[in-house]
Amino acid sequence: MIQKSRPALLQHQDVGDRVETLMLQPVIKAFLCGSISGTCSTVLFQPLDLLKTRLQTLQPSAHGSRRVGMLALLLTVVRTESLLGLWKGMSPSIVRCVPGVGIYFGTLYSLKQYFLRGHPPTALESVILGAGSRSVAGVCMSPITVIKTRYESGRYGYQSIYAALRSICHSEGFRGLFSGLTATLLRDAPFSGIYLMFYSQTKNVVLHSTDQLDAVLVPVVNFSCGIFAGILASLVTQPADVIKTHMQLSPVKFRWIGQSVTLIFKDYGLRGFFQGSVPRALRRTLVAAMAWTVYEEMMAKMGLKS
């Protein structure tokens, strides 16, 4: 009797494994779509991220009362580091964004399927889903984010990603790979939550206000809604981004958030919390809008609802 029941048990396990595999396939597709969309947007808009980092870390003592604008800094980088200098830090950016955006979209898709079960999210649900998905991706990719920020700042002479990892672990310990993680989550989780809320709500209003939208115009509508949502979300989370940058570049000086807020205000004043806001708003808005547009188009081609 025992021998007869074993094949049935194995057969039941095989069916369970197959069902589990089928359930995972859409998540893998969402991960791949997110990774591809993140790669495209990262390569295009990397110069804006570099300029944002440089603007946030300019020393006031070196420039006196004279403000350095984005255009002046752009010309300085091109003159001293060549045009390719604008793409400095591209390697860690790609290493971070390819899996990072994929993890975000994969997690978001899974949460939507589990909690929403097909119905569109409310404004509050969008905030929670976006913030939760971004938190998962942020924790997973924190070490690469630290390396990327230091690459872009121009203060560190890392020869490779591996050399950077080894140097940070040697000088700061394993904890150094998670410098500024709290500030990163305080910046990214609200950004993603606010962005997803504005994006989904704006898109619903636009789509419901038109009887029949031409399929060719759908990507344009998605991109436009993404631009609007990105601008609002970027402005709200700008101070947290400045704090995160300082904590990752100077972890000895900026040890915790409260201390960082005090030091930034002392050195730069209230304006210091909004340094680099223009390139960041441009980049985050364009990156998010393009990533969502490409992601939704690819998911539609695969027959999946994003």
Swiss-Prot record:
Gene3D superfamilies: Mitochondrial carrier domain. One of its GO terms (cellular component) is mitochondrial inner membrane. The keyword Repeat applies. Disulfide bonds: none annotated. It catalyses: glycine(in) = glycine(out). Solcar repeats lie at residues 25-114, 121-205, 217-301. One of its GO terms (molecular function) is glycine transmembrane transporter activity. GO terms for biological process: erythrocyte differentiation; glycine import into mitochondrion. SUPFAM superfamilies: Mitochondrial carrier. It is found in: Mitochondrion inner membrane. PROSITE patterns: SOLCAR. Pfam families: Mito_carr. Keywords: Membrane, Mitochondrion, Mitochondrion inner membrane, Repeat, Transmembrane, Transmembrane helix, Transport. InterPro entries: Hem25/SLC25A38, Mitochondrial_sb/sol_carrier, Mt_carrier_dom_sf. It is a multi-pass membrane protein. The chain crosses the membrane at residues 31-56, 89-115, 127-152, 180-203, 221-247, 276-294. It comes from the Eukaryota. Its main location: mitochondrion. PANTHER family: MITOCHONDRIAL GLYCINE TRANSPORTER. Belongs to the mitochondrial carrier (TC 2.A.29) family. SLC25A38 subfamily. Mitochondrial glycine transporter that imports glycine into the mitochondrial matrix. Plays an important role in providing glycine for the first enzymatic step in heme biosynthesis, the condensation of glycine with succinyl-CoA to produce 5-aminolevulinate (ALA) in the mitochondrial matrix. Required during erythropoiesis. Plays a role as pro-apoptotic protein that induces caspase-dependent apoptosis. This is Mitochondrial glycine transporter. It comes from Ovis aries. The lineage of its organism: Eukaryota, Metazoa, Chordata, Craniata, Vertebrata. The gene is SLC25A38.
